Amino acid sequence: MAVGKNKGLSKGGKKGGKKKVIDPFSRKDWYDVKAPNMFQTRQIGKTLVNRTQGQRIASDYLKGRVFEVSLADLQKDIDPERSFRKFRLIAEDVQDRNVLCNFHGMDLTTDKYRSMVKKWQTLIEAIVEAKTVDGYLLRVFCIGFTAKDQQSQRKTCYAQQSQVRKIRARMTDIINNEVSGADLKQLVNKLALDSIAKDIEKSCQRIYPLHDVYIRKVKVLKKPRFDISKLLELHGDGGGKTSEAVVSAEGAVVDRPEGYEPPVQEAV
């Protein structure tokens, strides 16, 4: 080893060696994520975002975030028929520390979907695009399987292609009628209760008995122009109020008209 002075050590090491460690969470704020009033659980969690600094507004970074929640958590229900459905909610607006979400899609869990696919039966699937009354364009995926006759000794329960076409046409008609005759809130209630799939299963019994009929997935393809009043109505904050409630220093609620200005005092 060469004998000599270490210039780096004699000058105190590298420049900027001692840096101040800043906790990244000190620059972030927590926001409550709110689900629409069509679900029993309104607060579904919290989300982090960097605090507003200059032109970087925190609400702009929150809008567009998608949250995936199980239907069992949204409805406070331990029924296993609800646990495998996942609803997607998208953040559309921010009020104070509340992130207001709207419906953005639905899906089944992977384990449930794979457990339904079995041998000796026919899989029937229909994909339908329909528009709700309030202007949401949705793509709905429906799935069903042929059921085995209990009195038959046959191992298989395959349907003929003519029967498959009839069942698929019946699925398409029912989904079109249910979606086009309801707004988004009514449609979400139907998806939560699984009423569309039950109607399809009941209607197709004469063609061929079915089982495990589900609305497998729902995608939102197109939305109407954003309206804050409709979003507040979904969250139970609308209703056309003409006055706002103001809390005084003593804690009492005082109703004052919109645009109220306090009188000018002569002396302070």
Swiss-Prot record:
A cellular-component GO term for this protein: cytosolic small ribosomal subunit
Ribonucleoprotein among keywords: yes
Compartments where found: Cytoplasm
Domain of life: Eukaryota
Protein keywords: Cytoplasm, Developmental protein, Differentiation, Oogenesis, Ribonucleoprotein, Ribosomal protein
Pfam short name (any one): Ribosomal_S3Ae
One record GO biological process: translation
Cited InterPro entries: Ribosomal_eS1 (IPR001593), Ribosomal_eS1_CS (IPR018281), Ribosomal_eS1_euk (IPR027500)
Region of interest called Disordered, as start-end residue ranges on this chain: 1-21
Tagged with keyword Ribonucleoprotein: yes
GO molecular function: structural constituent of ribosome
Disulfide bonds: none
Oligomer and partners: Component of the small ribosomal subunit. Mature ribosomes consist of a small (40S) and a large (60S) subunit. The 40S subunit contains about 33 different proteins and 1 molecule of RNA (18S). The 60S subunit contains about 49 different proteins and 3 molecules of RNA (28S, 5.8S and 5S).
Function text: Essential for oogenesis; required for late follicle cell development.
Similarity field: Belongs to the eukaryotic ribosomal protein eS1 family.
Protein name in UniProt: Small ribosomal subunit protein eS1
